[in-house]
Each structure stands twice: as structure tokens, then as C-alpha cells.
Amino acid sequence: MKVLDEIVANRKKMVEIEKRKDIIKNLRSFIDELDIDVEKKRKLRLSKAIKKAKEIKNPIITEIKPSSPSKGSIREINLEDVKNIANEMVEGGATALSILTEPKYFNGSYKNLIVAREFDIPILMKDFIVDFYQIDVASEIGANAVLLIVSSLKEDIGEFLDYAKENDLECLVETHSEDEIDIALDAGAKIIGINNRDLKTLKIDLSTTEKLAPLIPKNKIKVGESGIYTKEQLNYVLKFTDAALIGSSIMESENIREKVREFVIK
């Protein structure tokens, strides 16, 4: 079984468990405990933040990613660590935060996103979305955008885009091939991610961005994803995109604030 297929199959099972447990109710209680004004934070927009950031700095979506299938454990963190890391990322100049909420393969959690929601910055809920229920959760916990992966949702992606819009959420629609870009565009995607990592093999090729970006109309927002470890690599990706999503290299850094700042400065 390919890595993506395995993750998606597991996520479908987990979502059914989440539904039965009515986790939204528990998450609401957690939000109340932290006294976070989720309603106020819902007004933040990823697309607007990227456009504004481009005028003065490199627009970087920094990712809180504890582990991954390709690297294993990246950084062991608790909720207090998440808050501190998010703060360092914001102080470093991040345009938005991406929070992993997939629990088994990335060691993420919805509570990580809620803790990071304290900050006035757009938040992308990064997960393998396979069910509308996950979009309900994203809306409840204060996410501003969700990740939709074309290779897992395929032609159904239009329905998920529509449902997210109904819940006042933007979508980062992830692609890795010409066919997937066609599907994303046909579905009406406005923010399109180009993943330099092949989710079937986990191999990275930064030239994927260069090959695919010209296929995306200029009125769309393009985001380069995966494989960015140096400023040189970032500059290469940003030649073809409007923003970049960076996770592992920041999470591995001993000084997250300075690492983000290094990427952000033009």
C-alpha cells in the first residue's frame, strides 16, 4: 500500500471514531478553558495575508509539524511548546501558520491548533481531509483555511471546496502533477499548492514547482510546498510562486525565531 493510501485509509477510520465520540463538544470545552475568541479570529484570511506580505517580505507559511512518515520524530512537543513555537514563528515574521492535526503519522492534534489560535495570524489546518466532518471541526476550532489534497480527493474536491466555503474557510488545494492542477482549476480553487514531494514515494524534487507553476493562472495564489531547507532553495521556489510553506527545516532549528526571520527577509 502506498504511503498516501495508508494515511487516507487510517484517517477515514479515525474520523468515524471522532464522530462517535462527538469530539467537537470536547474541543469547545477546551476553547472555553483557554478563553480564546475563536469568532474574532475567523475573520483572518490566508489569501489576503499572502498578498499583503508580498509587498514587504517573503510570504512564509510556517508549519508546526512534530513528526512525519519520511523523517519520523522531528520535535517532541507538548501544548506549552506549541504555544511557544507559534509565538516564535509569529515574532520571526511568518505570514501564516500551518498546524498538523493528523495524529498517527504526524503526531498532530486539534488541540495544537487551538493553542496556536491565540495569535492574530491566519491558520491553515493541515490534515488529510476525507470527510466533511473534518471541515466542521476546522470551523469550530478557529482555522481560517484547510488543506485539500487532489491526489486523495480527486474529482470530489469540488464538493469539499464548496462545503469549506459554506463554513467560511479558504482552501489550500494541493497538487503534484498537470492532471491534478487541471482538476483543481476546474473545481474553482483559488489558492493552489504545488507539493515538491511525491506523496506516493515521499521523494522530493524542487523542480516540480518550476514545471507546474506556469500552468496556474496569474489570478490564483500559488504556494510552493516541501523540500525547502535553505534561503537559496526558498528563493528558487519563490521565483515561481507567491508564497512557500516550510515545516521540517524550521521545526528542526535550535532557534525557530531566527530561522523564520532568515527565510522571511528578502
Swiss-Prot record:
PANTHER family: INDOLE-3-GLYCEROL-PHOSPHATE SYNTHASE, TRYPTOPHAN BIOSYNTHESIS PROTEIN. It holds the Pfam family IGPS. Belongs to the TrpC family. It catalyses: 1-(2-carboxyphenylamino)-1-deoxy-D-ribulose 5-phosphate + H(+) = (1S,2R)-1-C-(indol-3-yl)glycerol 3-phosphate + CO2 + H2O. It is an enzyme of class 4 (lyase). Keywords: Amino-acid biosynthesis, Aromatic amino acid biosynthesis, Decarboxylase, Lyase, Tryptophan biosynthesis. SUPFAM superfamilies: Ribulose-phoshate binding barrel. GO terms for molecular function: indole-3-glycerol-phosphate synthase activity; phosphoribosylanthranilate isomerase activity. The keyword Amino-acid biosynthesis applies. This is Indole-3-glycerol phosphate synthase. GO terms for biological process: L-tryptophan biosynthetic process. Pathway: Amino-acid biosynthesis; L-tryptophan biosynthesis; L-tryptophan from chorismate: step 4/5. Signal peptide: none annotated. InterPro entries: Aldolase_TIM, Indole-3-glycerol_P_synth, Indole-3-glycerol_P_synth_dom, Indole-3-GlycerolPSynthase_CS, RibuloseP-bd_barrel. Its EC number is 4.1.1.48.
